[in-house]
Amino acid sequence: MADCDSVTNSPLATATATLHTNRGDIKIALFGNHAPKTVANFVGLAQGTKDYSTQNASGGPSGPFYDGAVFHRVIQGFMIQGGDPTGTGRGGPGYKFADEFHPELQFDKPYLLAMANAGPGTNGSQFFITVGKTPHLNRRHTIFGEVIDAESQRVVEAISKTATDGNDRPTDPVVIESITIS
């Protein structure tokens, strides 16, 4: 991507993902040089160009995977998690892939985009955005992007403070309406 630094304000960015949610847009710089398989997976699912074997968040067998998905787990001061088409925390695309850890990417600041998983090599479609430093996650979750502007960070913060039930699920759904990649 030409001159991506001026677009994303991140020297690591290879593309930008904009999550259009019912609470506002979240712009994220994607780190394709540091986590190429993870970024390719996310972009492919977002655009509907990557095959998957489960129903997407809209209930279909093909097309953009994340459109209509909710942030199903929100923990104030920690993170917001989405990307599960079922909204339960147990769904995914029907496949798993390996972690990609890069020494330049550490959970040493908020607003990092990373893969949610159930242990080594179990990445699929679920992701989270941190709202604080989370060094205990280093080498456990693949970091593949960062929220890049103050307005997007405010949206993430607002989502992180939304009311939740006893299972950390927002009582008023936070919906990913669509994702655009540029």
UniProtKB/Swiss-Prot annotation:
Provide the protein's localization. Answer: Cytoplasm
Question: Looking at its record, which EC class is this enzyme?
Answer: isomerase
Gene3D superfamilies reported in the protein's UniProt record:
Cyclophilin-like (2.40.100.10)
Catalyzed reactions: [protein]-peptidylproline (omega=180) = [protein]-peptidylproline (omega=0)
A Gene Ontology biological process term: response to iron ion
- Keyword Isomerase listed? The answer is yes
Q: Name one GO molecular function term.
A: peptidyl-prolyl cis-trans isomerase activity
Q: Which UniProt keywords apply?
A: Cytoplasm, Isomerase, Rotamase
InterPro entries from the UniProt entry: Cyclophilin-like_dom_sf, Cyclophilin-type_PPIase, Cyclophilin-type_PPIase_CS, Cyclophilin-type_PPIase_dom, Cyclophilin_A-like
Family classification: Belongs to the cyclophilin-type PPIase family.
User: Its biological function?
Assistant: PPIases accelerate the folding of proteins. It catalyzes the cis-trans isomerization of proline imidic peptide bonds in oligopeptides.
What name does UniProt use for this protein? Peptidyl-prolyl cis-trans isomerase A
Tell me which species this is from.
Mycobacterium tuberculosis (strain ATCC 25618 / H37Rv)
